[in-house]
């Protein structure tokens, strides 16, 4: 029976994602930033750095949102330190997570293929059949 091993970094990143999600939600409102949500957190093995991936509800304002979060990263880290019981809270590095945008683009492409339908042929196939 194989047991799945969990590393401390996995547990800490999950906790950071939960706590930081709440903190970022409040900070966005307080600082007038575009609305974002924390989608993932990757923490270095030494727990010194955390890559925080965020998604913006308004894609066109994503750069503004990430810049605003980078500007207040120190404040967010202080609030995170109060919420978590860690000796050392990782330094926060914010990045835009474009996986949702890429997923929507792929979904739209697949939907367009469905609209063409299985009975439709391209002009190249029509030329070959003649």
UniProtKB/Swiss-Prot annotation:
Keywords: Cytoplasm, Ribosome biogenesis
Coiled-coil portions: none
Alphabetical list of Gene3D superfamilies matching this protein: 3.30.300.20
GO molecular function, one term: ribosomal small subunit binding
Principal localisation: cytoplasm
Subcellular location as annotated: Cytoplasm
Gene Ontology cellular component annotations, sorted alphabetically: cytosol
GO process terms (BP): maturation of SSU-rRNA
Annotated spans, Disordered: 111-130
Recorded family membership: Belongs to the RbfA family.
Quaternary structure (record): Monomer. Binds 30S ribosomal subunits, but not 50S ribosomal subunits or 70S ribosomes.
HAMAP family to which the protein is assigned, alphabetical: RbfA
Function summary: One of several proteins that assist in the late maturation steps of the functional core of the 30S ribosomal subunit. Associates with free 30S ribosomal subunits (but not with 30S subunits that are part of 70S ribosomes or polysomes). Required for efficient processing of 16S rRNA. May interact with the 5'-terminal helix region of 16S rRNA.
UniProt protein name: Ribosome-binding factor A
Organism: Xanthomonas oryzae pv. oryzae (strain KACC10331 / KXO85)
